[in-house]
UniProtKB/Swiss-Prot annotation:
Gene name of the record: SPL18
Compartment(s): Nucleus
Residue ranges with Polar residues bias: 192-209
Protein name: Squamosa promoter-binding-like protein 18
Induction record: Negatively regulated by microRNAs miR156b and miR156h.
Chain segments carrying region Disordered: 89-110, 179-218, 233-261, 358-381
Organism lineage: Eukaryota, Viridiplantae, Streptophyta, Embryophyta, Tracheophyta
Amino acid sequence: MDWDLKMPVSWDLAELEHNAVPNMAAAASAAEPGIAAVAASRGAPGRPECSVDLKLGGLGEFGAADALKEPAAAAKAPVSSAAAAASVAKVPPSTSTLKRPRGGGGGGGGQCPSCAVDGCKADLSKHRDYHRRHKVCEPHSKTPVVVVSGREMRFCQQCSRFHLLGEFDEAKRSCRKRLDGHNRRRRKPQADSMSSGSFMTSQQGTRFASFTPPRPEPSWPGIIKSEETPYYSHHHHPHPVMTSRQPHFVGSPSSATTAAFSPKEGRRFPFLHEGDQISFGGGGGAAAAATLEISVCQTTVVAPPPPESSSSNKMFSSDGLTTATTTTTTAHHHHHHHQVLDSDCALSLLSSPANSSSVDVSRMVQPSPAAAAGAEHHHHHQIPMAQPLVPNLQQQFGGSSPWFASSPAAAAVAGGGFACPSMDSEQQQQQQLNAVLVPGSNENEMNYHGMFHVGGEGSSDGTSPSLPFSWQ
């Protein structure tokens, strides 16, 4: 079938609608009698019911629906036209308003505000927006005194208001209230900064003390003096006393030593009796057979036992944070055995006096009965412990050596002696004379002479007894 596109298409809607109703009703009745009955009942002219749902063959209701919709459309048309007219009328005012002055621009909408100062007729339209907004001209905003409503006032450039003259600061251009708030914001109260001086205090101390003040040390040079007099008689074997010049920490050997005794000079005991002297020579006698054990220390403490093959004694001590070297000088009958041992641990921390001079302080320690029984044995033993004992030297030697007599000066200067029990009673030496040397900063020695004797209270297996260490 050919379509002629050039022919104008004309549709008669009323005629189509009129012819479609009986045709659809006949088709519906032929197809289904129930649907035709429903359509006939709904399409009755006496019922003005408008159906909005989809129904098959409901073309006959379009006419009634359109008839009902036409009055509503006619009623809406005037309303929409009125709304369009109103919107068109509102557009010009909204587009015409470009910028309005804020905050009391004046009585009328288009009237420019004037200056609030009495008698000022300045046109603020030529001024900045700031002046128009606050109703003040630029000259009067900086004038110290103006009259506003019959009162002398001044314009505050900080809060942008007129204030009385009493509210203003003389040197500033702002009122005191504004200045106080400004200063409070800028000068906030800050916490007091803790200076280092509050922590690093002197010995008097303050609230804060970061470290304790040092202990007062005795002034040894003020108590004891030394004299360079040939008071020792040195014969053929010099006895070197080794002291440490520099601090030796735990496990470090002694690097530099100096000899305190030499055949050319001697030291004197000014606090002993005149004529009392000690001979370090090789001459015979009970005093010469005593073992001399000179240790560079201030306190003797517990030390681990050495092997059985060792023939020396160790004494461990500390000078501040240093470990001093130990010199053991053993004088047998007609023979002197010298041996220097470096201490390898420090069990106590004590500080020695600075600038200590070379002084000899006599100390007396009473030996145990086991020492006399094993005097003929020449084996050295470990000194495991130290206990203070202050006996009389006359009981030790039976008056054989007048030098060992106790004097009040020696008892006042020297502390308590130390009697050290040994490990084996059968292998004990003769009485030992120990000189405790305290190294000073001037390379001199302080000699505390006393009898340190190794007792026989130890066990035979070489272990040292565990005794408490006490100070007196």
